[in-house]
């Protein structure tokens, strides 16, 4: 049986971070297992040095998946995550795309992007 995944994208704006300015604030993406998904984060931040990606699943604390080091064009994965599962693509200035590969049911949740100085 093929499972479909629902990925909710929410972009919050706490005082200590900058976040996406997507109209409506939340988008939904559904993809079959073993496929890929792309999540776009558009930030109008002139001095963005690090773009952080988080996953929040029901009943669990948010988990940082990775951060993208803008100056070095490099993803830094959190320990324990599979290399090649997540990576960031930057198609244009102030836009970052998180790509999730080989989706499984456990990838369902709410994904956040944020920028911090470090």
UniProtKB/Swiss-Prot annotation:
User: Is Cell membrane a UniProt keyword of this protein?
Assistant: yes
Signal peptide boundaries: 1-17
- Is-annotated flag, keyword Thylakoid? no
CC annotations in GO: external side of plasma membrane; T cell receptor complex
Glycosylation positions in this chain: 106
InterPro entries, alphabetized: Ig-like_dom (IPR007110), Ig-like_dom_sf (IPR036179), Ig-like_fold (IPR013783), Ig_V-set (IPR013106), TRG_var/const_region (IPR051117)
Q: What is its main location?
A: membrane
Please list the disulfide bridges.
41-113
**Localization of this protein:** Cell membrane
Q: What does the entry give for GO biological process?
A: adaptive immune response; innate immune response
- SUPFAM superfamilies linked: Immunoglobulin (SSF48726)
Keywords for the protein's UniProt record, in alphabetical order: Adaptive immunity, Cell membrane, Disulfide bond, Glycoprotein, Immunity, Immunoglobulin domain, Innate immunity, Membrane, Receptor, Signal, T cell receptor
Highest taxon, organism lineage? Eukaryota
Q: Which Gene3D superfamilies match?
A: Immunoglobulins (2.60.40.10)
| Domain called Ig-like: residue spans | 18-118
| Oligomeric form and interacting partners | Gamma-delta TR is a heterodimer composed of a gamma and delta chain; disulfide-linked. The gamma-delta TR is associated with the transmembrane signaling CD3 coreceptor proteins following the stoichiometry: a single gamma-delta TR heterodimer associates with one CD3D-CD3E heterodimer, one CD3G-CD3E heterodimer and one CD247 homodimer forming a stable octameric structure. Upon activation, gamma-delta TR complex associates with FCER1G to initiate intracellular signaling.
Please explain the role this protein plays, according to its UniProt record. V region of the variable domain of T cell receptor (TR) gamma chain that participates in the antigen recognition. Gamma-delta TRs recognize a variety of self and foreign non-peptide antigens frequently expressed at the epithelial boundaries between the host and external environment, including endogenous lipids presented by MH-like protein CD1D and phosphoantigens presented by butyrophilin-like molecule BTN3A1. Upon antigen recognition induces rapid, innate-like immune responses involved in pathogen clearance and tissue repair.
Instruction: Please give the name of this protein.
Output: T cell receptor gamma variable 5
Organism encoding this protein:
Homo sapiens
